[in-house]
Amino acid sequence: MIVTTTQSIQGHEIREYKGLVSGEVIFGLNFVKDIFASVRDFIGGRSNTYEKAMIDGREQAQREMEQRARAMGANAIVGVSYGYETVGPNGSMLLISISGTAVVIE
C-alpha cells in the first residue's frame, strides 16, 4: 500500500476515491519511566523513552489506518497527516492520530 502526504502519486492515476480513513492510538507511559524521562529532559538530554513510544505509536496508528483502507477496497492513501496531543490527568497520556483519503490507483 502506498501512503503519502501528497494529494497525488507520481506515475499513478487515482481511479476512485473511497473516503476518509484514520488510525488512532492512545497510551500512557510507565510512571517510573516518566520520572526518569522528566529528569533527562530537565538536564537537557533526549528522552529515548518518549521518542520510542512516539515512533511505536505512529507505526501502530498507520497500520490501523492501512487496514481500514484495505477493508474499503483501497490500494493507496493520499493526503496523510499526523496529529499528536497529550490527554489525561497531567498530560499523562499521548494521543497519536493519522488520517488520509483512501483511493484506488492504477
Spans of features found by a protein language model:
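Short, well-ordered alpha-helical segments
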Residues: 21, 31-81
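N-terminal presequence-like segments and the immediate start of the first folded domain
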Residues: 1-33, 71-75, 86-88, 92-106
